[in-house]
Amino acid sequence: MAISRQQLAKELEPGLNALFGLEYKNYENQHAEIFDTENSDRAFEEEVMLSGFDKAGVKSEGAAVAYDNAQETFTARYQHETIALAFSLTEEAIEDNLYDKISTRYTKALARSMAQTKQTKAANVLNNAFKASGYNGGDGESLIGNAHPTIAGNLSNRPATLADLSETSLEQAMIDIASFKDERGLKIAAKAMKLIIPSANQFVAERLMKSANRVGTADNDINALRSMGMVPQGYVVNNFLTDDDAFFLKTDAVSYTHLTLPTSQYV
């Protein structure tokens, strides 16, 4: 349905001091702190998880060498989505408006809507990361869980007990990340690179990441997280995260990828 003079009645009358409600600042490109962007020219993209080899065993003199098998374990498919929204104006609404050019005004509003949709959908990958169904990865498990199946057994990428952001929980996360293993149970030299938090956690994160001494204690201990450079890229706030208690650590082991298609020539 087109926007008509009925929806813009006040703008047909002289004497308005201002029109407001559309000129707000935006949170720009916060998805880039979570995802690395790659281009795509296909309807979907697939990524295959590979398994290498187990640790080698001792071979007795003259005995045959033991052989091991490498294999594919699972495939993740990423299906592109088309995000669309439009508006239309009646000729009379355009001609009889006494103020700014309304087509330009609402084109800017539409761009803001599209941009915020992009940020919301990107953050929803983390917002839904703990859900047991409907948002599973290629291994059939939620993005963050304690039962990711591998050839060597189940692996976890979450705390044994979920906890709010604190010195204790952040240090335990560093310990857990250092113990990550691959499909065959070989240790991965993974390191936390960036802390991703909702805005409600920014003050806690600032104290934890930048205080020279430990936070909330009278002990004259150094802040080990800071002095050891455990999170070299610091913390970033994502204003589209919906759980005020959640925090996420991006490691250097595997990156999240945001796949983009060329903009349609018809848009």
Language-model segments: what does each one mean?
Residues 216-221:
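Gly/Ser/Thr-rich active-site loops/lids in small-molecule metabolic enzymes
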Residues 131-215, 228-246, 250-256:
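Extended, solvent-exposed, turn-rich assembly/linker loops in the middle of proteins
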Residues 22-83:
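Assembly/oligomerization interface modules of large self-assembling protein complexes
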Residues 74-134, 195:
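Long, contiguous amphipathic alpha-helices that act as assembly "spine/axial" helices in icosahedral shell
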Residues 1-25:
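N-terminal alpha-helical "arm" segments
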Residues 266:
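Cationic, low-complexity basic patches in intrinsically disordered or flexible, solvent-exposed regions
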Residues 257-263:
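Conserved small/polar residues in nucleotide/adenosyl-binding loops
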